[in-house]
Amino acid sequence: MEHIRTPKVENVRLVDRVSPKKAALGTLYLTATHVIFVENSPDPRKETWILHSQISTIEKQATTATGCPLLIRCKNFQIIQLIIPQERDCHDVYISLIRLARPVKYEELYCFSFNPMLDKEEREQGWVLIDLSEEYTRMGLPNHYWQLSDVNRDYRVCDSYPTELYVPKSATAHIIVGSSKFRSRRRFPVLSYYYKDNHASICRSSQPLSGFSARCLEDEQMLQAIRKANPGSDFVYVVDTRPKLNAMANRAAGKGYENEDNYSNIKFQFIGIENIHVMRNSLQKMLEVCELKSPSMSDFLWGLENSGWLRHIKAIMDAGIFIAKAVSEEGASVLVHCSDGWDRTAQVCSVASLLLDPHYRTLKGFMVLIEKDWISFGHKFNHRYGNLDGDPKEISPVIDQFIECVWQLMEQFPCAFEFNERFLIHIQHHIYSCQFGNFLCNSQKERRELKIQERTYSLWAHLWKNRADYLNPLFRADHSQTQGTLHLPTTPCNFMYKFWSGMYNRFEKGMQPRQSVTDYLMAVKEETQQLEEELEALEERLEKIQKVQLNCTKVKSKQSEPSKHSGFSTSDNSIANTPQDYSGNMKSFPSRSPSQGDEDSALILTQDNLKSSDPDLSANSDQESGVEDLSCRSPSGGEHAPSEDSGKDRDSDEAVFLTA
């Protein structure tokens, strides 16, 4: 609170960006964690909450006649424009937010003060919800080809890798350590995903320190060990996700890529994904297009094309598709790296795994995928997403691009994913919110030193608890799209990359429908389920009606002939003794035989009993069941009028006899 100069400012206007003339008047509050705007209108009383950690930039604009404008851009693509009456108050709010949005130490982040009112045991259970050891067991590891290595225990070899790593069985500790010394940041080749159907694998590392001519025997042996771990293939793909020009430039700095003359049985492949600086600028250009007020279609499309954003998304997708095909169709193992192996490598490995394994297309499986390929393998969350005050050139939307790749796949395969768009948007939101501890720091080592699991809560438990909100109504576990590998069209024209308005314009009320597609589909699904339940109830009622009719038929069968011992005249006291054919009225029902209990006791129903004993059966038999009213004429005489089908087969049908 010591950084807040003015905690409360009244008569502040919140400008509607779609309709600038519509400005809500209210009060602005600054707290230790949020900026809060509360409208004065009591009905309804609206509040706008913004986390300090979500603030990307703050722009103090020139003072106007109405006040001093303050423009706040957020990392979740929300834009807030405030007009503060006094310039002094505006300056105090501006200075306060500059400091609050850029904390200098982790303890200032929201997750260390966030308290969802859970006890210690519940917090611990939230952190063990996602267990990577169970995930590797699900893959079929360890086995004859891969083993769990403790070579990185206490982070002795690589401080940005996790302590538990899977390596080929033929790779000794000497080979591993030697390979790490020849790789940037000592990130040696390790297993990311094992495709147990054909023993192919996806491995990841950083670039080799090869320069123009340097080589390392242990690193060459490491790649041979990866090849031997796949008996179905005699070569390994080495995929460098960088543009070839960039990789060649790194050679001049003593880094670079593998020389095929030194590494036997490898096939080298460049992909061409640009670096973090190009991606940051591309996103900025696209957001500038999104901020245009009432742009023409041509201006919007030109700006989107000029940003290059969708081209970068396609490059990441192309890399993932190439790796997935190499593994599933060619049966070849793949080693993926970029420069340091924690940005483009994470993108490509996770996209390929998502295409290969339907488990990662489920709610829990997707959490596991992010935990495995992003969190445990040392993606630099702090540097890339500006959790703390640092170098702005390190910020880049790396995981945002991966999340968009998933959304593009969901648009192409709408029945293949258990989760919906809202699930992806909420994950993106909490990567920047710092409300949970999952996405803090740059490595597993840093998180353990800060005791993140003991001091914060897990996002995965929160999402899992509310999983009903994130279900895809089109998902079917038995659908062809949910089985095995996703095969994308080979021709580019069959795969359309779209602008994700649900992400980048989701706060623009005038651009989004009042009801999202997901909510609409969920409503349709719930209504369909309700109708199915009503149909089931009606079918049960039909069974009851049919049972009554069968019992009446039984009675008629037993009393069809006149009683020889009764003292009553059958012509005077019988309601009807003319056989009738009800097959025309019952042709919609399946033939049923009466139960054993019905055979033992005859059921005699009076006309009044038939009408009053079950109001539902009496009142609704015509309207809902399609069964003709079986009530008879008075005992004074007369017979039932024969049905339309009575002359078809009188000998095969039995008459219904109802005793008055």
Swiss-Prot record:
SUPFAM superfamilies on file: (Phosphotyrosine protein) phosphatases II, PH domain-like
Reactions it catalyzes: a 1,2-diacyl-sn-glycero-3-phospho-(1D-myo-inositol-3-phosphate) + H2O = a 1,2-diacyl-sn-glycero-3-phospho-(1D-myo-inositol) + phosphate; 1D-myo-inositol 1,3-bisphosphate + H2O = 1D-myo-inositol 1-phosphate + phosphate
InterPro entries linked to this entry: MTMR7_PH-GRAM (IPR036003), MTMR7_PTP (IPR030572), Myotubularin (IPR030564), Myotubularin-like_Pase_dom (IPR010569), PH-like_dom_sf (IPR011993), Prot-tyrosine_phosphatase-like (IPR029021), Tyr_Pase_AS (IPR016130), Tyr_Pase_cat (IPR003595)
Biased composition, class Basic and acidic residues, residue ranges: 641-653
GO biological process: phosphatidylinositol biosynthetic process; phosphatidylinositol dephosphorylation; protein dephosphorylation
Gene Ontology CC annotation, any one: cytosol
Modulation of this protein's activity: Interaction with MTMR9 increases phosphatase activity.
Location of the active site: 338
Phosphothreonine carried by residues: 578
Topology within the bilayer: Peripheral membrane protein
Region feature (Disordered): 554-660
EC number: 3.1.3.64
Gene3D superfamilies: Pleckstrin-homology domain (PH domain)/Phosphotyrosine-binding domain (PTB)
Polar residues bias spans: 566-596
Enzyme class: hydrolase
Cited CDD domains: PH-GRAM_MTMR7, PTP-MTMR7
Protein name: Phosphatidylinositol-3-phosphate phosphatase MTMR7
Source species of the chain: Homo sapiens
